[in-house]
Amino acid sequence: MRNTLIPILVAICLFITGVAILNIQLWYSAKAEYLAGARYAANNINHILEEASQATQTAVNIAGKECNLEEQYQLGTEAALKPHLRTIIILKQGIVWCTSLPGNRVLLSRIPVFPDSNLLLAPAIDTVNRLPILLYQNQFADTRILVTISDQHIRGALNVPLKGVRYVLRVADDIIGPTGDVMTLNGHYPYTEKVHSTKYHFTIIFNPPPLFSFYRLIDKGFGILIFILLIACAAAFLLDRYFNKSATPEEILRRAINNGEIVPFYQPVVNGREGTLRGVEVLARWKQPHGGYISPAAFIPLAEKSGLIVPLTQSLMNQVARQMNAIASKLPEGFHIGINFSASHIISPTFVDECLNFRDSFTRRDLNLVLEVTEREPLNVDESLVQRLNILHENGFVIALDDFGTGYSGLSYLHDLHIDYIKIDHSFVGRVNADPESTRILDCVLDLARKLSISIVAEGVETKEQLDYLNQNYITFQQGYYFYKPVTYIDLVKIILSKPKVKVVVE
């Protein structure tokens, strides 16, 4: 489990680090863009005020003359030829003397008083048409020249084509943005960044880009994000390959058990005469992540040698109970479910409790749970062992001796333990052919079982000759490729649904 998590954690850390670095770079880039945009807006305002400054020079020349129709026409022409100017007003001793509008009209409801600056933002309430304006002032002795600039031109100058930023013009303590009226800050400064004009008394203020922006990452760095993700996945893949290569077979098997890669296969047990389904033997298979299965012959000996056979069997028990409960209503009464148990598992302190919990996890109580004792390891038969198996037998478990005759002390087990079934190994059944000599050993085994009143299950039935021999000798329970090979749970469900439910009677 640890070796599985490390590549994943490394990949996550690499991806997060890469995203963090990319985000910082994009943030600095966005800050530079915002600053460049503010300078661009300031430059736009400078150009507008440059027009206003030039217009005041013309107005000064007119102020030295008479304010007649010709002079008003000249003022109007000056205002019209300057694309960003609205009106020009000449004041003498604080009184409107001449304007660029006919009849010396002004669009101000009152003449404002300028602070210590030549710029002033007038709110909509101070204008006739209720639109805010920017005023530029130039003072010559007792003559004041006022130039008004429409809010549309100011907003246009502030409208820099950058997403996510709002530029605001600040004059003294008043501000105007791309929308809305003139506002007074009154000591409250919601904007943290600013660019000062080097020519006029105004400032472009704005807020910096957010430190983290998912939209910015996708919009500006999508390609790099994909590259970072590929690098992180490649690192995880290489680490996983490294750990798998350097891990011992035992560690690899332990990881497979923890990851649920050891799954149950089911080989049906049938009535050899009728072909009816009587039960299943649970067999372990190692499911590969990329498809395919590994035979138990490749990993069961390692599991027994390393002690992993116990957690492996526990995992199978949990899976079998869950799967059988899902189709419990489809199983015939007395259906056999057999699981192999090694000697090391049987002598473990928790074995009896595990088996009882296994039984209690089934929703049906009329199933025959078969404990198949394997002979691959020697089993030390003592009083404690006999007591354990007797407890399980009394609680409804059926005890079977698997692969009889191929392992350790099979005959002594028959003498010392309460055995309900012996399962004749396929190596004996496989010898059966037309030659009478081929069945001598098997005949002896069958005769022994009958004398001890022990039922028999024949494994490895593959030919019609073997089937006929077993039926002639009244061996009811049979399993092998002649009937069914070991199948997945899904295939077992299909088999069960295709067969009528028949009560299983022990014969």
From Swiss-Prot:
Database matches in SUPFAM superfamilies = EAL domain-like
Transmembrane domains' residue ranges: 4-24, 217-237
Sequence ranges assigned to domain EAL in this UniProt record? 246-500
Q: List the EC numbers from the record.
A: 3.1.4.52
Major localisation: membrane
Topological relation to the membrane, as annotated: Multi-pass membrane protein
The cellular location(s) given in this protein's UniProt record come to: Cell membrane
**One term of GO molecular function:** cyclic-guanylate-specific phosphodiesterase activity
Q: InterPro entries from the xrefs?
A: CSS-motif_dom, Cyclic-di-GMP_PDE-like, EAL_dom, EAL_sf
**Swiss-Prot/TrEMBL keywords:** c-di-GMP, Cell membrane, Hydrolase, Membrane, Transmembrane, Transmembrane helix
Q: Name the enzyme's class.
A: hydrolase
One GO biological process term is: regulation of single-species biofilm formation
One Pfam family cited in the UniProt record for this chain: EAL
Q: Which GO terms describe its cellular component?
A: plasma membrane
Q: What induces it?
A: Induced by 0.3 M NaCl in an RpoS-dependent fashion.
Q: Which Gene3D superfamilies match?
A: EAL domain
Write out the catalysed reaction: 3',3'-c-di-GMP + H2O = 5'-phosphoguanylyl(3'->5')guanosine + H(+)
Explain the purpose of this protein.
Answer: Phosphodiesterase (PDE) that catalyzes the hydrolysis of cyclic-di-GMP (c-di-GMP) to 5'-pGpG.
Give the matching PANTHER family. CYCLIC DI-GMP PHOSPHODIESTERASE PDEB-RELATED (PTHR33121:SF81), CYCLIC DI-GMP PHOSPHODIESTERASE PDEF (PTHR33121)
Q: What is this protein called?
A: Probable cyclic di-GMP phosphodiesterase PdeG
This protein's species is: Escherichia coli (strain K12)
